[in-house]
Amino acid sequence: MPEALSWLGMRIDDAYGARVGTVHDVYLEADGSPRWIFTLRRRVLIPAWDAIAGAGRVWVPYQRDLIESAPRLWSLDELTPTFETETRRWYAAGKDHSGWAAHIRS
């Protein structure tokens, strides 16, 4: 079983430690590596390839405001290659590592 599936139910924190939501689902690549984290509360996908898990939490290198304003995924039918591309671009434009290294070191 891929390790990322153990993230289900874990708290998601942003790069600064602010709570974002809870892992409701993890979408995997064909090789089992994590691709997207889905949080039901916000109905958004969060890129999982830079996520770090431990101590019952998953940390992602994005600010909560960026995640909260990401494109909404209302149904799995909307999870198309076009939606993924738009979502990937959304996060690429707003990625913030400034608090990431300091948060992980603490």
Q: Predicted segment positions?
A:
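Peripheral interaction segments used for macromolecular assembly
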Residues: 1-106
